[in-house]
Amino acid sequence: MATTRRAEATWSGDLIGGNGKVTAATTRVFADLPTTWKARTEEADGVTSPEELLAAAHASCFSMAISNNLAKAGTPPTRVSVAVEVTADKTDSGWTVQRAHITVSGVVPGATQESFQEAAEGAKDGCPISKAIKGNVELS
């Protein structure tokens, strides 16, 4: 069964001096998050960016995928924590998301370091957000 989620953004002004707002239109769990070009390319200063939202989506997705993999291996986690750092940089073709670095830790009774690593590798390959960016962005 397919699911569809919707987000909306508005932008006012030009790229450099303008500003925007992002809303989770399906759930409204967040609304009118401010965003600016400066938040994307310099300091965030309390303002989000598409790259930060991508990192949040990836971290959330990855945490679900690794939890599922660990449970399927017979070692359901008590807790997993996932941090994703998305790096964008200016290239000859313009600004590009270049990599997503994933850091994972957890409390997983009965799991070995090897089985945890195997579950993480499976999550890297199986998480739908990882799949969406794989081939375009370096995943580590």
Ranges and model annotations:
Residues 1-56, 63-140:
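Extended beta-strand/beta-hairpin segments
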